[in-house]
Amino acid sequence: MEVDLRKLKLSDQLKKVNEIIDSDFIETSIITNEEAIIKIIPMQILNKKIKCKMKFIDDCWKVNLVAKEVA
């Protein structure tokens, strides 16, 4: 699943990222133009079994989240 948050306000992006992290996903990509999101994601997934890979491409961030264990 790929979620593009670039057209949302920062507060709406934060809500959506929280929803995604708290959901039962196997793999998802988040595209954002807000650096604040990039700083918050690692803190939010610290105690969860989620791998994170971030790339800066074409003036936006792409964050790939992968669940380490699939139930």
Protein language model features and the residues they cover:
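Residues that cap or initiate secondary-structure elements
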Residues: 9, 36, 69-71
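C-terminal edge-of-domain segments
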Residues: 49-71
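An N-terminal amphipathic alpha-helical segment
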Residues: 1-25
